[in-house]
């Protein structure tokens, strides 16, 4: 099981998602899968990022609600969540 680390940006992003009426249970479900190193179902379109986000991964909680994270040996860092326009 990986140690969970949340960045300040991620925590702020979650508050914004709640204000937007997003179903946070969807985010929690993905986090639970990632923490136990379980592969995400294909519908989440999990993939590596390039450019400024090299070394990180992104998955789609919903078509325009993304999660950016980084997996280390013993931890997983949740860096950002939001829409494409919020993050890129």
Report the location of each language-model feature.
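Basic, Lys/Arg-enriched alpha-helical interface segments
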Residues: 1-58, 63, 71-77, 85-88
């Amino acid at each position: 099981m990986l140690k969970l680390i949340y960045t300040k940006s991620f925590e702020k992003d979650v508050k914004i998602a709640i204000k937007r009426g997003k179903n946070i249970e969807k985010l929690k479900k993905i986090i639970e899968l990632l923490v136990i190193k379980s592969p995400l179902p294909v519908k989440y379109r999990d993939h590596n990022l390039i450019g400024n986000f090299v070394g990180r991964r992104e998955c789609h909680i919903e078509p325009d609600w993304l999660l950016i994270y980084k997996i280390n040996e013993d931890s997983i860092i949740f860096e950002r969540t939001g829409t494409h326009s919020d993050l890129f």
